[in-house]
């Protein structure tokens, strides 16, 4: 049985995630739990614009669209770089830059 990885939230990512509506928080938590167990989230994609090894979890709820950027290619933990509510079709430049910096 694979080791259960820790989740490490960088910067304000935990605070940002906790500001999601309850259903979106639950969905994000479930997807992060899958990552901890070495499984693939249901709806994710690589974010090469942010950096090598960075992916995003995509969550769509009645209240809107939400994203969680993370890095899983480290053996010790899943690193959550940024969590945000999408307000436009494209990911905003400031969100990409913030995730890159972390």
Protein language model regions, located:
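Portal/gating segments that form or line small-molecule/metal binding sites
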Residues: 68
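Basic, Lys/Arg-enriched alpha-helical interface segments
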Residues: 1-65, 74-77, 85-102
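Short hydrophobic/aromatic beta-strand micro-patches
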Residues: 71
């Amino acid at each position: 049985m694979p080791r259960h990885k820790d989740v490490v939230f960088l910067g304000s990512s935990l605070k940002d995630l906790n500001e999601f509506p309850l259903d979106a928080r639950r969905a994000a938590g479930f997807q992060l739990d899958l990552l901890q167990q070495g499984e693939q989230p249901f709806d994710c994609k690589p974010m090469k614009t942010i950096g090598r090894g960075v992916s995003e979890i995509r969550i769509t709820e009645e209240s809107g669209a939400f994203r969680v950027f993370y890095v899983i290619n480290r053996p010790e933990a899943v690193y959550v770089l940024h969590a945000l509510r999408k307000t436009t079709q494209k990911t905003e430049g400031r969100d990409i830059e913030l995730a890159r910096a972390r």
